[in-house]
Structure formats: C-alpha cells, structure tokens
A protein has these predicted regions:
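Transmembrane alpha-helical segments
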Residues: 72-76, 125-137, 155
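Alpha-helical transmembrane segments of multi-pass membrane proteins
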Residues: 9, 95-99, 120-131
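Amphipathic alpha-helical interaction segments
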Residues: 83, 111-112, 131
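Residues at structural and domain junctions
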Residues: 23, 103-106, 119, 129-132
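Transmembrane signal-anchor hairpin modules in multi-pass inner-membrane enzymes, especially those
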Residues: 1-104, 138-149
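Membrane-interfacial helix-loop-helix modules of multi-pass inner-membrane proteins that assemble, modify
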Residues: 44-57, 105-119, 141-149, 153-178
C-alpha cells in the first residue's frame, strides 16, 4: 500500500473512532478536547520533528512554541470564562507554588536561561491543563475521556509511522547506531 493511502486511511479511521468516542461519552466540553490535544502533544515528538524543522535545543521549534502558546491561551480563556478561583487554588497548594517559584528562580543561575525559562513555561501550561481538568464537572471522567482520545490518536498513527514512515517512526541510538 502506498504511504499516502495509508496516511489517508489512518486519518479517516482516527476521525471515525474519535467521533464514536464523542457520541458515546457524556463529557463534551471544549476543555476536554484541549486537554486531549495537549496530552497527544505531550506524549509524542514535537511538531517540528514531524515537519523536519532542524533546530538547536536552545532555539526550539517555532510550530511547537505556537502550539503550546495557543493551548495555554485557550486554557486561560476557558478558566476565566468558568470563573476558576485561581487564588484559592494556589493558596491551598502552597508547596506546589513554592516549587514553581523555585523553578522560575533557578532560571537566573542556569547555564542556558532561555531553555530553562521555556521549560518552566511548559510546566506552567501543565498547571493550566490541571486547572482545566479540576474545573470540570466530573474531573475523573474527563481525564479518562481525554486519555482515551489521546490513545485513539497515538496507537494508529504510531503503527503508521513505524510501518510506512520509518524516518519518523523509528529511532536508533545515536551513540551505537543500533
């Protein structure tokens, strides 16, 4: 089978499975889909890797930055729309806030402050996603639904990449070549 046909069939299959999951699930909020997108992104290579964008670790990938920025902004907007009590949540989790503040402070003495700051930003987006999850009516059901959607995306596309697009689906040890 030609790789393009396999990609088309896999994409159609994933869309059908996601549609079935959407209809069967009682979790239909937009936040659960944002969480699913973020989970799918977090568990795979970056978007830049699939687009063959050669970047250094210091500069990162522009599509990845834009994706994370978009997900973070949409998450913040949803939290504001829901009236999420961020101040109260931060007060109840003082130790977590202290760890985040320490991580931000560590940017000052890091060997590569730009990389450290970007990684801190990713942790902040993780916090936004957690707040989205706990602001849902049924957080446990929402998490299961978002995780299912991410798996429905991962599994078929992983098989597709391994079988038809080996350059993206297989990686060898850079030190031994195995």
């Amino acid at each position: 089978m030609p790789p393009q046909l396999a990609l088309l069939l896999t994409s159609a299959f994933v869309l059908i499975v996601l549609t079935i999951e959407y209809r069967r699930s009682d979790i239909t909020s937009a936040a659960s889909w944002i969480l699913s997108l973020w989970l799918a992104y977090s568990g795979s290579k970056g978007i830049g890797a699939f687009l063959n964008i050669n970047t250094t670790i210091e500069s990162g990938s522009l599509p990845d930055r834009y994706f994370l920025l978009s997900v973070g902004i949409v998450g913040i907007l949803i939290l504001f729309k829901r009236g999420f009590p961020l101040g109260a949540a931060l007060k109840r989790n003082g130790l977590f806030v202290l760890i985040l503040a320490y991580m931000l402070l560590s940017v000052v003495w890091a060997k590569a402050p730009g990389i450290s700051f970007r990684r801190w930003g990713r942790e902040l987006i993780t916090l936004i996603m957690i707040c989205l999850l706990i602001s849902e009516e049924f957080p446990a059901k929402t998490f299961v639904s978002a995780f299912k959607r991410a798996i429905y995306f991962y599994l078929p596309f992983s098989i597709l990449l391994i079988k038809y697009f080996g350059i993206f689906g297989r990686e060898y040890n850079r030190w031994t070549g195995e």
